[in-house]
Amino acid sequence: MNQKNGNGLNSIKKIISKCCNTDNFDISEQKNDKDVLIFKICSNEVLNIDLDKLCAQDFYICFEKCTIKILRLSEKKIKINLNLFFNSCSFEEIEIYNVYFLGQFKISELVDTLEKIKDIKFNHCAFNNLILEKNKFENNICFEEKTKIKKIYLYENEFKKHFFIKKCFIGSINLWKNEFKNRCYFMDSKFGYDEDENKKAKLNFSNARFQDNVYFNNSHFYDYVDFHECEFEKITCFYGVKFYKTPNFSACYFKEPKAVNLINVDIDKLDFKSVEKYIEDNYKDESYKNETKGMQDKKEFFKIKNKHKLRYAKNLKDSFRVIKDVLITQNNTLEAQEWHKLELYAKEKENHINLSVKDREKNADIFKNILIWFNCVLLNVYRNTSDHHNDFLKILNFTVGMIVLYGVFIFFCQACIEPYSKFFNELKSSVIFIIIGILVFLCWIMFYFNRKKSIFAKSIFFIIAMVFIVLYLVTYFYKTNEYKTIL
């Protein structure tokens, strides 16, 4: 039944009467701020809602200041098209099995005045849009057994008992500003989407406060998950968690760092490219959009763009540092080194962004510019030659390469330079001028190199230039006794 076809209060009342098996309720209609017609139900009785009798309906219904009981344990799967809202209600019992809610399902401003309160359970259910807003739950909240939720939005709730998500599929979750006074479980579940990147899942746990133990055991996070400014006061368990994209733990507070379990956390998917992608995918936030709205000045636009990129790079660096410090507190230096490597990735990207900003500034501090450039090149070289001392194969390849290169230098000296030794001896007086010329040339390359965006190209050129200097010094000192001793 569609409200657009002229559903009146009487027809809606008959539907609700059959659904709740009572006529003792008041019904009214009103429009919300989006001009959508909502039917409000108020009653002093306990309304025992039969969801099977709502399958064919399609309208917005709000139970307000009612006592609700929903018990649906049938093996038969049903779909509910209508939008169900529960405002300022109390729940005697909710246990729902095998129901797919196509519309919105919302519980707000819950009032628990009952002496006996049972758990709120959803098993083998599916939700398109689930909202829990400004509630104080005295019940255990349980989502179990492959319940699928495309969007779950929890805002300013207080959970006095357990909050439980196990073996569920969560597309998007927003846990902003919730207070969990008892244990929380987000176990054996999948957050985000495995393959479909166009869904753009949002996994936001930020600003939540966990006063008791919280467990994320064996869960998979397929998209960016945001834990920034979360407070964890007791045991925090990430055992067996896998992050497919870069997580954000910036400004997280762990009251007991030694109570944080990071055993078997899988971050193999995280590398320098994932750090770059995180910044590119996230810097265009609401603040960025507000600042650049209607802007025509390209220079100012570029400045704001890099300011926000820099902010996200710094936040990411702090995020990796937080986990690194926790692991160091636990004397787990091996795992801490992995997170330190990610921290250096973020630092390199921060320097890169800083460098692009300084390149465009007219009155930039040249000395500071040189330091940023040099740090950026060094981090790039370390990353590509040894992955910041974490990749033995890269270190071995680089070492073997240097030995081979040294052998080539020796061969070059013996085979090519010997016949021209007299000529080189005549150039001894001009050595200092040649070295100065090389340094000036390097400075010119640093400030006017066309491929400013390619730090890797600069690093390669830097290495080649250094090799050139070494070759010249080898040539110059070839005839001295000291060099012959080295050979």
Locate each region found by the language model.
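Terminal module of membrane-associated proteins
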Residues: 1-487
